[in-house]
Design a protein with these regions (language model features):
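Short Pro/Gly-enriched beta-strand edge/turn motifs at strand-loop
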Residues: 30-36, 206-213
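Conserved active-site and cofactor/substrate-binding residues in soluble primary-metabolism enzymes
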Residues: 131-134, 161-168, 219, 241-245, ...
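Conserved Rossmann-fold dehydrogenase catalytic segment
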Residues: 118-119, 147-156, 178-194, 210-220, ...
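Oxidoreductase and adenylate-handling cofactor-binding alpha/beta cores
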Residues: 144, 163-183, 196-208, 251-258
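Short Gly/Pro-enriched turn/cap motifs at secondary-structure boundaries
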Residues: 39-41, 49, 213-220, 226-227, ...
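Glycine-rich beta-alpha junction loops
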Residues: 19, 115-117, 190-195, 232, ...
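N-terminal helix-loop segment corresponding to the beta1-alpha1 unit
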Residues: 1-179
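Aromatic-enriched alpha-helical interface/lid elements that frame and gate functional surfaces
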Residues: 224-305
């Protein structure tokens, strides 16, 4: 969140503890150091650290000490927004929660980014990480291929959902403060952000009793959609047909216009019911083309591909 705010021109100060620095400093991801060399100041060289902390100033404060907390309060007194991602007990334990920060600066905006929010629920005190969140709010259940076990997303996207939520909330809070002179406490729960991303599955479960299913790269009503082999070893192309007109265009491009009249594939319901057979037809065709050549051919016909 802070990196995006810095991109927009905000002065952002990142605070780290002397014994608990930012975990992305260690360059644990393969290849995260320039030229794969740690260098003498390796703690400042990790690409992940520099990406997430771009545009920020750095400050070390030991908030477990009285002196550290006093310095933090001085910083709060001249700040517009404070962001923290501790579990709920931490800021309360330091007397740095919203009621106490308001005493220092009445119009302060506090952003608390936790796993499950600051409510009274049984999960409230639980720490969180994006991968575990995917399992808790149900995303893993609908990710993966039919007949296989649940899977996580390729990247840990829940962190970014809470980031974007925070950015919009901060903008709204600043606007509100400019009109009313009042600050706000923005309580973001990663769980809520992730559950929002599954809203159609949740509504389907509530309304129809369906639990959702794993369908890999397929889509329930954009058919065909998938990642198909192209010519060459381990070369692939994705395409997504969103209407009967796009399906007709694809059939013509494949040189098989009769497929559009085939009762197995003539409309989206038929194509859904015969998805396996359809995938075989598409796969046999795509694997005869270079992936880039085929992408341009499909795009020229108005069919999303990449």
């Amino acid at each position: 969140t802070g990196g995006h705010l810095a991109d927009l021109g905000a002065e952002v100060i990142k605070i780290e503890g002397p014994t608990r620095p930012d975990l992305t400093r260690n360059g644990g991801l393969f290849g995260s150091f320039p030229e794969n060399e740690q260098g003498g100041d390796w703690w400042n060289r990790s690409s992940t650290y520099n990406l997430l902390n771009r545009g920020k100033e750095s400050l070390v404060l030991d908030l477990s000490t009285e002196r550290g907390r006093e310095l933090f309060k001085e910083l709060v007194s001249i700040s517009d927004v404070v962001m923290e991602n501790f579990t709920p007990r931490v800021m309360r334990g330091w007397n740095l929660d919203y009621p106490n920060l308001k005493k220092i600066k009445p119009d302060i905006i506090l952003v608390s980014n936790t796993g499950y929010g600051h409510g009274e629920g049984p999960y409230s005190s639980y720490p969180a990480q994006a991968t575990t969140q995917e399992g808790t709010h149900g995303h893993c259940w609908v990710t993966g291929y039919e007949g296989e076990e649940p899977a996580k997303a390729g990247r840990s996207f829940v962190d970014f959902l809470s980031t974007w939520t925070g950015i919009f909330a901060i903008g709204a809070a600043l606007r509100y403060r400019s009109r009313t002179g009042k600050g706000q406490w923005i309580d973001i729960a990663m769980y809520q952000a992730g559950a929002m991303f599954l809203s159609e599955y949740l509504m389907d479960a509530i309304s129809n009793g369906r639990e959702g299913e794993r369908i890999g790269n397929r889509h329930p009503h954009r058919i065909p959609q998938g990642c198909y082999p192209a010519s060459g070893e381990d070369q692939w192309i994705t395409l997504s047909v969103g209407s009967d007109q796009e399906w007709l265009s694809l059939c013509e491009l494949m040189g098989q216009p009769e497929l559009a009249r085939d009762t197995r594939f003539e409309d989206v319901i038929s194509r859904y019911q015969n998805y396996d057979e359809l995938d075989v037809v598409i796969r046999e065709w795509t694997q005869t083309f270079d992936k880039y050549e085929l992408m341009h051919m499909l795009q020229a016909k108005g069919i999303p591909a990449g």
